[in-house]
Amino acid sequence: NLYNMGLLEPAGEILHDLGFSLESLCALEPDAGLGNGGLGRLASCYMDAATGLNYPVTGFSIRYEFGIFRQKIVDGWQMEFPDNWLEMGDVWLHTRKDDAVEVRFGGQVHEWMDGDKFKTAQTGYQSVIAVPHELYISGYGSKAVNKLTLWSASMPQSFDMNAFSRGDYVRALEQNTMAEAISKVLYPADDHINGKRLRLRQQYLLVSSSLQ
């Protein structure tokens, strides 16, 4: 953003006067393992190019808590560790809890005619709340500022007090844990049925919340 708005040099001079360097501050920000694949790079190029050309666009994705795993060699073996890109905070993201939407999973859809009106109702579903986090993108040489909306998932009620009071501590947090798993990890393993279901839930949450 500093580069796009022509503020890179002034920012560097101000930081120098304060005893810091822009390079050292930039080095502190972790390189998140998000969107590093071909499609991710292509999507970011679309956003950058459209904003630079003054087109009003909005991008959508999921606010993953962990990116692609980090790799380390330990005693000659490859080890995988979570990429906790949010451990230093998310100062670039603006959380909009008031704009959260409900996404319904599962259940049954009932259809009936009420006179000449066709009506539907969904029952037995699991409700998940999608909260938007907005990242603003400035255009190079343009006056446009567009946004990338990232969705995080949680339950409407994150704590089951009745289950906790019965001593069922795991169940008291189970539903919220299952909901938060949707936005937990980028590219979860899908070589088993639970992984396939999780990826489908991720895709459904992204489409439903973005359309809403």
Where are these regions (language model features)?
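A conserved ligand/cofactor-binding region detector
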Residues: N1-Q212
